[in-house]
Regions:
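Electropositive, glycine- and tryptophan-enriched low-complexity nucleic-acid-binding patches
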Residues: 1-43
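Eukaryote-biased feature marking scaffold/signaling PDZ-domain proteins and nuclear chromatin regulators
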Residues: 7-10, 43, 68, 80, ...
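Surface-exposed helix-capping loop/turn segments at secondary-structure junctions
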Residues: 37-46, 121-127
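RNase H-like two-metal-ion nuclease catalytic core shared by retroviral integrases
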Residues: 50-52, 58-60, 74-98, 104
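Short alpha-helical patches at protein termini and domain edges
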Residues: 59, 70, 109-112
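C-terminal anion-handling pockets and recognition modules
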Residues: 85-149
Length: 149
């Protein structure tokens, strides 16, 4: 799991097995809060976007967000074209395809993902976030249908 802001990439969290609401909240504690602190975002100024996966919308996760003064951005279900992290993962996949030798195990895949994640330039994150008004406009123009994003 990864998170990023306008000019930064947060800490990458390795997920083993299937994530549930409890593990999600642990990741928020261990990765989101430190990333927010390191980014210099003032307390209460963080607006967090996530999809509507049940673990994200669980009572446990909602309570955690409230307790940590993090505003959630309302999000339409089934809208990956509006989800900038999906496009960042696509960028990572393209970078992973550049390795000439296939990874020999899960540990090596994780190592490579972390290497690519840590090398992401802030401009990549900035461009994705700044593309949001165009993305929203395209969805409105398509009346909720498919877009080029």
């Amino acid at each position: 799991m990864g998170l990023y802001g306008l000019e930064w990439c947060g800490k990458l969290a390795e997920i083993e097995g299937r994530m549930d609401a409890e593990q999600y909240v642990e990741i928020l504690d261990d990765h989101l809060l430190p990333s927010i602190e390191e980014s210099g975002i003032a307390e209460g100024d963080c607006i967090f976007q996530q999809d509507n996966d049940p673990k994200h919308t669980s009572r446990k996760a909602r309570n955690w967000m409230e307790e940590n003064d993090i505003t959630l951005l309302d999000w339409a279900p089934q809208s990956p074209d509006l989800n900038p992290i999906e496009h960042l993962w696509h960028h990572i996949k393209l970078q992973l395809c550049k390795y000439e030798v296939p990874a020999t195990g899960v540990w090596q895949i994780w190592e490579r993902v972390a290497e690519v994640w840590n090398a992401i330039e802030p401009e990549v994150c900035q461009k994705l976030i700044e593309s949001m008004p165009r993305r929203v406009e395209a969805v409105i123009k398509a009346k909720g249908g498919n877009t080029k994003y």
